[in-house]
A protein has these predicted regions:
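Alpha-helical scaffold domains
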Residues: 1-226
Length: 226
């Protein structure tokens, strides 16, 4: 066991490990140490200041799920954009579950929207489930507000995948887009631009959202594919 692993096990909550394993199918139970996210997040902020951090970021693959979660949190703190992209591209092939994928949210991305868009297009075309999911999620996080352009909706709309965690992310993206950019997004639903399962899941998630008006929800209900 490495010295870092010893420190991680010192934060272990075995009940939480069992809970996390149920939420993350496909990841072996023995991979979970069981560290609560707020605890791991606090540790990550301190660990970034240590010399061992850089070494850890280049030691792939990791043995434990919690090490991958830590890796994602550490990447999110990297301040240099080019280095952050390098580390993200190195790590994504090793991401094997939605939780690790979704915890990655690099702060530096917000300052590099133009360069980031090219990376998003590449990630979204990947055949690797969680690289594709990360690309769509990053688009959703950074380009549905003041940096929005209607043409960006084509990126997730063109994704064709039978992978559950990709389809769910596309649905999540379009439900969020309906809430934030209704006029540009609703034609994608009205014209059946998405695969049937994703189309209906988008409508379901949008109807569940408090950001969608009652009138909009009523219209969406008429667009379900039966």
């Amino acid at each position: 066991m490495t010295s870092l692993q010893e420190r991680l096990f010192a934060m272990q909550d075995k009940q939480y490990a069992a809970f996390q394993a149920k939420l993350t199918p496909g990841v072996p139970m023995e991979s979970f140490i069981g560290i609560r996210v707020p605890v791991l997040r606090k540790f990550a902020k301190e660990f970034t200041k240590e010399e061992e951090c850089e070494e850890f970021l280049h030691q792939l693959p990791h043995q434990y799920y919690d090490e991958n979660m830590l890796h994602g949190l550490l990447i999110s703190e990297v301040k240099d954009y080019e280095e952050c992209i390098r580390l993200t591209d190195s790590f994504l092939p090793f991401v094997d579950n939605w939780a690790v994928c979704d915890i990655m949210s690099p702060k530096v991305f917000a300052k590099h929207k133009e360069e980031l868009l090219a990376k998003i297009k590449t990630w979204s075309k990947s055949s690797h489930v969680y690289t594709c999911r990360f690309g769509i999620e990053t688009l959703m996080s950074h380009y549905l507000d003041k940096d929005f352009k209607a043409e960006y909706l084509e990126i997730p709309a063109s994704v064709r995948s039978e992978e559950y965690y990709v389809k769910m992310m596309v649905a999540w993206f379009f439900a969020t887009a309906l809430a934030k950019q209704w006029d540009a997004t609703i034609p994608y639903i009205e014209q059946n631009r998405l695969a049937p399962w994703t189309h209906n899941k988008t409508i379901q998630k949008a109807i569940e959202s408090y950001r969608i008006t009652p009138e909009q929800k009523e219209h969406l209900r008429t667009l379900k594919i039966k």
